[in-house]
Amino acid sequence: MTAQSQNIVETPSRVRAHALGVNAPELAKYQDEPAQMRSGAVGKSGYLKLRFAKREHCSILAEMERRVPSLVQKALYWDEEIPELPCVTMISTSGCILQGDRLATDVHVEAGACAHVTTQSATKVHMMNANYASQIQNFIVEEGGYLEFMPDPLIPHRNSRFITDTTISIHPTATAIYSEVLMSGRKYHHADERFGFDVYSSRVAAQNLAGKELFVEKYVLEPKVESLDAVGVMQTFDAFGNVILLTPKEHHDRILARVPAHFDIKGGDCQRRDAST
């Protein structure tokens, strides 16, 4: 067994990233291996582990583990409204997500700690002629913890296939903001780029720290099978944003009161809210 294989076996999130998509019905047609380099090979099995802990005057990035092409360097404190908040930028050394990539991320916010995690720029899923790319994200937010996970938009290139699975484990007193923004593609790059990807599959689940399920949502987009411009789907819009807020009820009610539902097709703005705790 190689050193990489041993590390993968010893890291549950990496095991899941390599298995994700193998039995997914939406990816059944895309199980062929890339000719250039097999899926999940060295340089194509990325991993990030970030653990945040509370100290006297601020929270810190207490532990970090990284495997190419995933990279994090250090936490910065640039949020003037929350000066104790460590802000971490995730970087891809390959520049984009490629066919055969298997990516995993573990973020752990300890009791009373806080963290903001984002990306250096939009995440581009490169066009593919074999296989697919997969991603596992696992977040743990302990008692009184606060996590903002707000990456820049994801841009799927034409003929790309991407599957992502996210699990948020959270204490009832903690708060987590999770965001994913999906673009229609490189709209002005090529005539076939707008909704030219093959598959985008996303599953997000939340549970308490004992493993009790809070919610699960999954959507699979296959624009070559069914148009995404239909009413009730994208309806001519080019960006889809999904923001999930998990927070105690006293915060939840005040936030909902300030975020009304809104629809403006001329202005290109549609905002829906789900009033659930």
Swiss-Prot record:
It is found in: Cytoplasm. It comes from Yersinia pestis. Belongs to the UreD family. Keywords: Chaperone, Cytoplasm, Nickel insertion. GO terms for molecular function: nickel cation binding. It comes from the Bacteria. This is Putative urease accessory protein UreD. UreD, UreF and UreG form a complex that acts as a GTP-hydrolysis-dependent molecular chaperone, activating the urease apoprotein by helping to assemble the nickel containing metallocenter of UreC. The UreE protein probably delivers the nickel. GO terms for cellular component: cytoplasm. HAMAP family: UreD. Required for maturation of urease via the functional incorporation of the urease nickel metallocenter. InterPro entries: UreD.
